[in-house]
């Protein structure tokens, strides 16, 4: 059974998981479209997850652990050598964008959902003048320039194994040699690629949920031409890599 939730947008407490054959292009395309539609619909309450609000409120102890994990990622970001012209893959509502723009000259914020980018634009206010917002389906990304650094927060866990190598290879080619890449993701919780079916207002959406281990990321990044410099993993994982 797929649990639905009201328009207020709380994340379903119960999620239906299944494995689909994403090697079939028609299945992959359908999941891509569904996932984009899901995040467009979820845009108004996306930040509940960061704020421990609504169905994300796990009580004082659990919320404190979650906020401590976010703070650890933010501290690691603060020491990462991101600089110059930077690209953020899957910028979402701008929670991390506003932390990145303090460190770089200019930022390109990419996301497939225009609604979340609009939220980011409002969040940033006058600081948005440093940001170029672009609606991009990253599963089919064709960049037309190069950047000095890159960041991705909680994006790659929503990219299936069938797409991730090509995405990272594309990112590699879009970065200058030696460019740093900072990544934050949920820690690995399952060895199998999963599709989660989530429901909003009675409509079910298929969303990729593929949390990889640090060793998996090291392997796929190395294949794409990156060297992992450091990695830390608890409830959340963050890593720093360099474009070779």
Explain the meaning of each model-derived region.
Residues 151:
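A conserved beta-strand element that flanks and buttresses the S-adenosyl-L-methionine
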């Amino acid at each position: 059974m797929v649990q639905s939730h009201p328009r207020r947008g709380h994340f379903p407490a119960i999620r239906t998981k299944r494995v689909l054959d994403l090697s079939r292009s028609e299945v992959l395309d359908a999941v891509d479209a569904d996932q984009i539609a899901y995040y467009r619909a979820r845009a108004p309450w996306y930040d509940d997850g960061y704020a421990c609000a609504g169905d994300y409120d796990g009580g004082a102890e659990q919320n404190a652990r979650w906020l401590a994990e976010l703070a650890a990622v933010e501290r690691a970001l603060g020491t990462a050598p991101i600089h110059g012209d930077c690209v953020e893959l899957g910028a979402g509502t701008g929670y991390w964008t506003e932390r990145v723009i303090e460190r770089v000259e200019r930022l390109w914020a990419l996301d497939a959902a225009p609604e979340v980018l609009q939220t980011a634009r409002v969040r940033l206010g006058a600081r948005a003048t440093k940001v170029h917002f672009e609606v991009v389906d990253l599963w089919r990304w064709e960049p037309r320039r190069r950047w000095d650094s890159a960041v991705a927060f909680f994006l790659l866990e929503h990219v299936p194994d069938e797409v991730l190598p090509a995405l990272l290879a594309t990112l590699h080619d879009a970065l200058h040699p030696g460019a740093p890449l900072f990544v934050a993701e949920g820690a690995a919780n399952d060895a199998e690629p999963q599709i989660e079916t989530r429901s909003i207002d009675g409509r079910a959406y298929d969303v990729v949920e593929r949390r990889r281990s640090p060793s998996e990321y090291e392997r796929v990044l190395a294949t794409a031409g990156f060297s992992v410099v450091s990695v830390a993993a608890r409830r959340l994982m963050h890593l720093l890599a360099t474009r070779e």
